[in-house]
């Protein structure tokens, strides 16, 4: 009995402080001299995870990322001496984490409970799974620096996990592991610098609040294709861009976020559910494994390229802030491998509300609507981590992080502080309209208030691949704007008294709205629209508009006037074909057949107008 150690952590004694006061998720601790800002601490006997957010004398204010019920004054507070960090390595893809990167699946298997117990301490990445490691052309004696690629792990059939030297490391290679199976904490590389030997495992730990370094930021030049016609044609985003989707409840923010995750041309998806309903995350978990993407003729589940950070509305409020940073750090890690990453944050409003709650508990001076004065700066520091970059190290590679942030303003009010601060930062604004959603027009994107500042950046891409597209888009915007101006006149005097050309504008605008902008994301033919189909549909609709106007204007002075009624009666079949272009299924029919069908319809159009004028 006497040889049993009474204290496991005698050497940790000096690292303990004491709880002084508790106020919800905010805990004040004393005897904390020597702590650093944003240091990770463990609070109470349950060892709850917390982060120091303020220091005064030897008092520290701690933001706790778990439920603090049961913490009493005098409980120990253990300092860890390191910032809140995430583990980066093989095993991230296909996983689901909470806001502080605890693996929810593993916790569920260990506890057999649907709840996360307090203070649970499970490693984020499995220490028992082994991965097949293949060294790249790095030999013993070669010099490497931070960001260099030294190995390859086939994480799954969609993602090749490239092993990156820690950005802060450098030196001469003393040992590189031969090809074989290794666990994430096995040493696969040893470097020597200034006589100091460093051992590297497949696992990297990185502080979440610190952006990962890059060689340089590059201008974006490639579109982020979403598969939603209204977004790809009128308000395109780029790979490495920032986008906000504000909208009231029930407008379809989550459906757009999920459609982006399913069908966008990204290599890796990080989906952060921040303070939203748990059902939405479970829907993602249920749907994604069933959905597949075809790469090189092989169909794969898209869950293999997705990682989820779930921080639902019933989880502690403070962890929402951490979940956003966890998500962006995971995104930057995959960007450094040379991938195009998309991060969905659903929703940044809940994150801002968490900031507001913590700020209120700290008795800080409130600004607009009770949000803290630094709300704009916090949002900017998050969105500025997006971008297309030249990655650190060799071989040379480019990667990008695109951020799509959903914003839920109360009552759909776009003058809300979070929405207005976000719109000052992001470059693309997809505004959702309650009236469109009530009319069951989905995606309910208001084409009059939305905008994209990336149009000019993408002109080269369009000129090279789809030269006719830019004038078509300009024409569509003109027609929709004209229709909006005419709609007031129509309500006053009716359609009959309009000029013939205005009647054509109204009808084509109706065709555009119902059969081009509207899209059923729950149908097999329309849940995803490739860009060639979008351009083909636009071309036929706009050519119909131009020819109809030309026919009416050229015969206006002659005896055989062509009016809109004449066109409509003569071209019933053509108009039906125009409105049913969206039913072409890109998976079943294939690109060549759809293009041929659209070309045939275009010829029929021209022939029909020739017959009409003769």
From Swiss-Prot:
Enzyme class of the recorded protein, top EC level: translocase
Sorted keywords for this record are: ATP-binding, Hydrogen ion transport, Ion transport, Nucleotide-binding, Phosphoprotein, Translocase, Transport
Protein activity control: ATP hydrolysis occurs at the interface between the nucleotide-binding domains of subunits A and B. ATP hydrolysis triggers a conformational change in the subunits D and F, which induces a shift of subunit d. The c-ring is subsequently rotated and results in a continuous proton translocation across the membrane.
Which Pfam families does the annotation name?
ATP-synt_ab, ATP-synt_ab_N, ATP-synt_ab_Xtn, ATP-synt_VA_C
Positions bound to ATP: 247-254
Alphabetical GO CC annotations of the entry are: plasma membrane; plasma membrane proton-transporting V-type ATPase complex; vacuolar proton-transporting V-type ATPase, V1 domain
EC numbers listed for it are: 7.1.2.2
**Which InterPro entries has this protein been placed in?**
ATP-synt_VA_C, ATP-synth_a_Xtn, ATP_synth_asu-like_sf, ATPase_a/bsu_AS, ATPase_F1/V1/A1_a/bsu_N, ATPase_F1/V1/A1_a/bsu_N_sf, ATPase_F1/V1/A1_a/bsu_nucl-bd, ATPase_F1/V1_b/a_C
Check the record and name the Gene3D superfamilies matching this protein: 2.40.30.20, 2.40.50.100, Bovine Mitochondrial F1-atpase, Atp Synthase Beta Chain, Chain D, domain 3 (1.10.1140.10), P-loop containing nucleotide triphosphate hydrolases (3.40.50.300)
What is a biological process (GO) this protein takes part in? ATP metabolic process
Checking PROSITE patterns in the record gives: ATPASE_ALPHA_BETA
Mark the residues carrying the PTM Phosphoserine.
Answer: 142
GO molecular function terms attached to this record: ATP binding; ATP hydrolysis activity; proton-transporting ATPase activity, rotational mechanism
Assembly, in brief, is: V-ATPase is a heteromultimeric enzyme made up of two complexes: the ATP-hydrolytic V1 complex and the proton translocation V0 complex. The V1 complex consists of three catalytic AB heterodimers that form a heterohexamer, three peripheral stalks each consisting of EG heterodimers, one central rotor including subunits D and F, and the regulatory subunits C and H. The proton translocation complex V0 consists of the proton transport subunit a, a ring of proteolipid subunits c9c'', rotary subunit d, subunits e and f, and the accessory subunits VhaAC45 and ATP6AP2.
Job description of the protein: Catalytic subunit of the V1 complex of vacuolar(H+)-ATPase (V-ATPase), a multisubunit enzyme composed of a peripheral complex (V1) that hydrolyzes ATP and a membrane integral complex (V0) that translocates protons. V-ATPase is responsible for acidifying and maintaining the pH of intracellular compartments and in some cell types, is targeted to the plasma membrane, where it is responsible for acidifying the extracellular environment.
UniProt-listed HAMAP family: ATP_synth_A_arch
Family in the record: Belongs to the ATPase alpha/beta chains family.
Output this protein's name: V-type proton ATPase catalytic subunit A isoform 2
Q: Which organism is it from?
A: Drosophila melanogaster (Fruit fly)
């Amino acid at each position: 009995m006497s040889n049993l150690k009474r204290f496991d952590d005698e050497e940790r004694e000096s690292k303990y402080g004491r709880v002084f006061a508790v106020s919800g998720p905010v805990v004040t601790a004393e005897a904390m001299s020597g702590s650093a800002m944003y240091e990770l601490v463990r609070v109470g006997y349950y060892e709850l995870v917390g982060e120091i957010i303020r220091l005064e004398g030897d008092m520290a204010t701690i933001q706790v990322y778990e439920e603090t019920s049961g913490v009493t004054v005098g409980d120990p507070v253990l300092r860890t001496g390191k910032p809140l960090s995430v583990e980066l390595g093989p095993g991230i893809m296909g996983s689901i984490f909470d806001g502080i990167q605890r693996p929810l699946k593993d916790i569920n298997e260990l506890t057999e409970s649907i709840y996360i117990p307090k203070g649970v301490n499970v490693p984020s990445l499995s220490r028992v799974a082994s991965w097949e490691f293949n060294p790249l052309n790095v030999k013993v004696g070669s010099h490497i620096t931070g960001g260099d690629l030294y190995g390859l792990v086939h994480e799954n059939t969609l993602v090749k996990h490239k092993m990156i030297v820690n950005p802060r490391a450098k030196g001469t290679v003393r040992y590189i592991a031969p090809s074989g199976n290794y666990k994430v904490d096995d040493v696969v590389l040893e470097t020597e610098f200034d006589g100091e030997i460093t051992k590297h495992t497949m696992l990297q730990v990185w502080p979440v609040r610190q952006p990962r370094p890059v060689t340089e930021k590059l201008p974006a030049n490639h579109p982020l294709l979403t598969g939603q016609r209204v977004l790809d044609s009128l308000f395109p985003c780029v790979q490495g861009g920032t986008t906000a989707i504000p909208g009231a409840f029930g407008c379809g923010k989550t459906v757009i976020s999920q459609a982006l995750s399913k069908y966008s041309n990204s290599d890796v998806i990080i989906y952060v559910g921040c303070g939203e309903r748990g059902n939405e995350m479970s829907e993602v978990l249920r749907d994604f494994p069933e959905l597949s993407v075809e790469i090189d003729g092989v169909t794969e589940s898209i869950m293999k390229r997705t990682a989820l950070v779930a921080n639902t509305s019933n989880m502690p409020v403070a962890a929402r802030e951490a979940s956003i940073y966890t998500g962006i750090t995971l995104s930057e890690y995959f960007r450094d491998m040379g991938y195009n990453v998309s991060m969905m944050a659903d929703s940044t409003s809940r994150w801002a509300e968490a900031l507001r709650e913590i700020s209120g508990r700290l008795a800080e001076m409130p600004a607009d609507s009770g949000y803290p004065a630094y709300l704009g700066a916090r949002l900017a520091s998050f969105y500025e981590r997006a971008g297309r970059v030249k990655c650190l190290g060799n071989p040379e590679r480019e990667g990008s992080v695109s951020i799509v942030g959903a914003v839920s303003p109360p009552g759909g009010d776009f003058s809300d502080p979070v929405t207005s601060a976000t719109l000052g930062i992001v470059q693309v604004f997809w505004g959702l309209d309650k009236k469109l959603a009530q009319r069951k027009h989905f995606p309910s994107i208001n084409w009059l208030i939305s905008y994209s500042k990336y149009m000019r950046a993408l002109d080269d891409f369009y000129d090279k691949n789809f030269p006719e597209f830019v004038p078509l888009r300009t024409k569509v915007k003109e027609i929709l704007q004209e229709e909006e101006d005419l709609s007031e006149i129509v309500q006053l005097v009716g359609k009959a008294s309009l000029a013939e050309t205005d009647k054509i504008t109204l009808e084509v605008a109706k065709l555009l709205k119902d059969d081009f902008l509207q899209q059923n994301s729950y149908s097999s033919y329309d849940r995803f629209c490739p860009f060639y189909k979008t351009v083909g549909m636009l071309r036929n609709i706009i050519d119909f508009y131009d020819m109809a106007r030309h026919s009416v204007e050229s015969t206006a002075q002659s005896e055989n006037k062509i009016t809109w009624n004449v066109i409509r009666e003569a071209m019933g079949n053509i108009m039906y074909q125009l409105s049913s272009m969206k039913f072409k299924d890109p998976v079943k029919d294939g690109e060549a057949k759809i293009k041929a069908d659209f070309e045939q319809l275009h010829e029929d159009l021209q022939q029909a107008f020739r017959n009409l004028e003769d």
